[in-house]
Regions:
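Short, well-ordered coil/turn segments that N-cap beta-strands
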Residues: 1, 40-44, 76-80, 104-106, ...
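Divalent-metal coordination cores built from histidine and acidic residues
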Residues: 1-50
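Short amphipathic alpha-helices and their capping/turn segments at secondary-structure boundaries
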Residues: 29-38, 93-102, 154-160
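Active-site-adjacent C-terminal substructures of enzyme catalytic domains
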Residues: 104-107, 112-178
Length: 178
């Protein structure tokens, strides 16, 4: 079993409210480093939840901080891409900025989500920034579950020859039996 470690010190600590502390000043790189030292065969990267509920006024800065930690861990020899939970973005973060920040081997989960700004432009076409990220080697994960996923969005993407690189589930307490 492999795992991505949430950059928030307390992780996702509730069922429906996402109370992660995404203030980069509160990220504990020292603790993250010690966990990578202790579990190098298990930890495969860092996770940042990019949605309105967790970002607040921090905008894209939690992602930048996560990428910086990832670079430090890579310099120490650890495998450490960044995976993001892409969802209902706040107004101060755009899909263009988000997808443009991601690097080769990073992962964008919930690529077919329907909340706020999606991967589609106003005409239903995949945005150029999404294609650009995919061409750079950013992995697109459908991460399907009960929420954060849409069959019509999947069909629209497939009709444009846009396919996920990863097909995974999103099993949480509210979706495991639905």
């Amino acid at each position: 079993v492999y795992s991505y470690l949430n950059v928030s010190t307390f992780g996702n600590k509730s069922l429906c409210k996402h109370e992660e502390d995404h203030d980069p000043a509160d990220f504990r790189e020292d603790l993250i480093d010690s966990l990578f030292e202790k579990y190098p065969q298990v930890l495969r990267g860092l996770k940042v939840r990019m949605c309105k509920e967790t970002l607040g006024d921090h905008g894209i800065s939690p992602l930048h901080a996560g990428i910086e930690m990832s670079e430090h861990l890579k310099a120490k020899g650890y495998h450490c891409p960044v995976a993001i939970h892409y969802d209902d973005l706040p107004e101060n973060v755009t899909v263009k900025e988000l997808f443009g920040t991601m690097r080769k081997d990073d992962v964008i989960a919930h690529v077919f989500q329907t909340k706020a700004e999606t991967i589609f432009d106003e005409n239903g076409k995949i945005k150029d920034c999404v294609w650009d990220a995919k061409k750079r080697g950013v992995y697109m994960d459908d991460c399907h579950g009960r929420v954060h996923w849409s069959y019509p969005n999947l069909q629209n993407a497939f009709s444009q020859s846009f396919y996920p690189d990863i097909i995974s589930s999103d099993l949480v307490r509210v979706s495991e039996y639905t």
